[in-house]
Amino acid sequence: MGSRDLISSLPDEILGKVLSLLPTKRAASTAVLSKRWNNLPALVDKLDINDAIGGPGGFPEFIDKTLALLTNSTTIKRTSLNNEFQYGESQVNTWIRSFLERGCLQLYLNAQSLYTIDTEFFTSNTLVELTITGGFSPDGLLPPGGVFFPKLKTLSLVLMTFVDSDMYELFISGCPLLEEFLLRNDEIEIPPVWNALVSSPSIKRLTIVHHFPNYREAHDGCWFRTPNLVYLDYSSYVPDWYEVDLGSLVEARLDLRSWERLRDEKAGGYGDCDSVYDDEEYPDDPILGDVTNLVTGLSNIKTLHLSPDSLEVFYFCCKSMPVFHNLLTLSFESAKKEAGQCCHFSSISLLT
C-alpha cells in the first residue's frame, strides 16, 4: 500500500495557518515540494523573518521574493524582522514600508546594527501593535497631518532613540488611540535623548525604565500628563522635580533610584534610614531629587509596589507625605518597620 500525502489534501486555508507557525524562511521553502505547494506561502498571515536562520547570504533576496509572493495575500497579522547583520539602509526601509503597506496589524523590529527609519512613510492605518528595539532610530519629516498610527494601541520602544528628543512627544501624539506604552532606555554608553515627557489622554498602562547615572542632566525633571492612566511601572534615578496628572491611577510599581551619595557602599548595600548618611562626612552635600509631587499624585491608588531604593528616596527626597486613603495593598522589599516610618496609610495589606 503506497504512502498517502494527507497534509496536502487539507484545505488551503488550513495549510496557510500551518505555514504561519513556521519561520518564514522554512515556510517559503515548502514551495518546491510540489505544484500543490507552489502558491501556499502566499497564504501565510504571519511573517517571522530572521537572518540568524541560514545567515546573511541571500537574505535580502529572500525577503524580496517573499514580499513578491505576498502581493495578493490576505492581511498580514504579525510581522517580525530580526537583523543581526548589516544591510543597506534604503533596503531595510523598503522592507518596512512593504510590511506597512500590506496592512500589518502587529510589527516587531529588532536590529543589532544602526538604521535610520524614514518617518515620512512610517505610518499605517491598520497597525495596532508596534515594537521597536535595538538599532532602529526614526528620523526625518513627519507624515502628512503628523499622525503616524491612527489605530495603534500598544507601543514599545526598547533601547531605541530619536535623533530629536522632541520626536518622542510628536510620536506619541501621532497615536491618538494609544493605550499601552513601554519605554526602556538604560544603555549607559548611549547618551539619553528622551525629553522626560509622556503626554497622552488615552494611555492606560505605562512602563518607563530610564537609567542614566552618568548623565545627571537627563534627570532635571519629569512630566506624566496621563489623566486616564490606571497602571504605572516606573524605574528611574530621581529627577529634580515632577509634574504629574495621575487622577485615574489604580496601581503603581516604583523603582526610584537614589544618586551615589544615598548608597551605603561600605556596607555593600543599604543601611537603615538613620545610618545611610554620615553628616560629618557629607556636611555640605545636598540631597538630590524631589519626588514630592509624584508621591502626592499617587495618593489615590489602591495598590503600591516599592523597591528598597524607593523607600530610601521616599524618606530623603519627599518634603511631605500624603495619606493614602484608598490603598489596599502595599508590597516592598524591606522591613515593615522602615515602611511604617516613611509612609502613612489608612488600611492596607502588607506584602514583603
UniProtKB/Swiss-Prot annotation:
Source domain of life: Eukaryota
Keyword Transmembrane helix: no
Residue ranges of domain F-box in the record: 4-50
Renumbered ranges of LRR repeats: 101-124, 149-173, 175-199, 298-323
Keywords: Leucine-rich repeat, Repeat
InterPro entries tied to this protein: F-box-like_dom_sf, F-box_AtFBL13-like, F-box_dom, FBL60-like, LRR_FXL15/At3g58940/PEG3-like
A Pfam family hit: F-box
PANTHER family to which the protein is assigned, alphabetical: F-BOX DOMAIN-CONTAINING PROTEIN, RNI-LIKE SUPERFAMILY PROTEIN
Protein name: F-box/LRR-repeat protein At2g29910
Taxonomic lineage from the root: Eukaryota, Viridiplantae, Streptophyta, Embryophyta, Tracheophyta
